């Protein structure tokens, strides 16, 4: 049409006849208008075609974060905790809130999450260390490179590592002897008893559990107030509960005590009355209390490690300290209460120290510690005190079994970073699929007509599709992970073994269980300031 218009314009200029010139000019104008309309129609069709092929987002706009977006969001700042890599960029999180990692056993949590952060983070750190691998690989580095004091609680003497001690009852004497805080002693003892005899979700038999806790509270108050620090220990508590003669002698001592305004004597009177009027219930209380401290019997593995203290958990806040709790993997299920008792005390001690100096708790085998009394409630307060908890579990079902559904949901809501990989449980895969959200996709329908010679017709529609289906999550490659970070789009990131990062690969000592780690050419490099002795 535009060519015709040009020809008409040339003809109108070159033809001398006025009528012909007028006709050619009019024809050219008509051609221009027609051409413009045709071009506009073509553009309109193209616009509609693109609109038909572009999802509207009406069902959702979920998508994964890109590497550039991660950099703009501050997730590549090495001042934070290490998470993985995305499009060649190492990912870190500098927030103050907590983290949780969910992955099955032998899936690489240690090599791609725990060890990297023990080699990277210079904050004081408390580490649960099944097998002693974490201390074996990272303790020397944290002592020599970061200049930290290293404590290894290692009752079983694994791998020739140090065998430091911590007495969980010693601080009760400190409270009793300090008149300014003595009134808090009964609350401390009650919290200890609740940790030793936790309250499960199933509230049946609560009467007997409370009876056992009352017995523990009474004896611990007596231990704290009688002025014999060397015998204020869990093995001594076991001796009293286990031996009827010692129990009688202890009750006589308590009855004559004026400590705490007569509270200790009142406990003795109450216990004696229960023993006289309801001996069967009293025997149940004794059995429950004895069972709670049975792992601390004087002939057991833990006895020496809890008889005295070589350090204070408060040092985690006031200095630069790394504390490793080493336990054989086959003892986690039977002696996990030791981990739980010390972990609760460590968190409490650090939270009570002034200031907000950062302290990291790396809690592997978290569900096997037993229930940490009050943890789900205190998680909301700890970030403001500089305390960050990284919980590591094999499945969310483990958490629900120990803490119940409501408390588990609270723990998850307080985890600013949620890390998942090697997912095989369908329930977890479904939960993750829902959490990732939905996106809008275009669907194409083809109508072949009723007759063989009918032209096929096409129609487009929109539908909702999960960003990843449960099956796609379960079939993710081994080296990939899903990161859910509060206020950010989800990230499908790479897991990064510590030996692929310089200088981590040089800092890590050989694994005392599996030997030397691989030494490929590093994929990533970080730069650290030299340690200063000031």
Please report, for each region that a protein language model flagged, where it lies by residue.
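P-loop NTPase motor domains
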Residues: 82, 90-96, 100-389, 403, ...
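Basic- and hydrophobic-enriched, low-structure N-terminal and domain-boundary segments
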Residues: 1-107, 111-114, 159-162, 168, ...
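Short alpha-helical interface patches
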Residues: 44, 50-77, 237-244, 313-316, ...
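Glycine-centered flexibility motif
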Residues: 84, 193, 227, 395, ...
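Short, surface-exposed polybasic-aromatic patches that bind anionic ligands, especially phosphate groups
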Residues: 497
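Conserved ATP-driven motor cores of ASCE-family P-loop NTPases powering translocation/secretion/packaging/pilus
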Residues: 379-485
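Short, flexible active-site loops
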Residues: 2-7, 325-326, 361-363, 414
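Short intrinsically disordered, low-complexity coil segments enriched in acidic
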Residues: 2-7, 429-432, 520
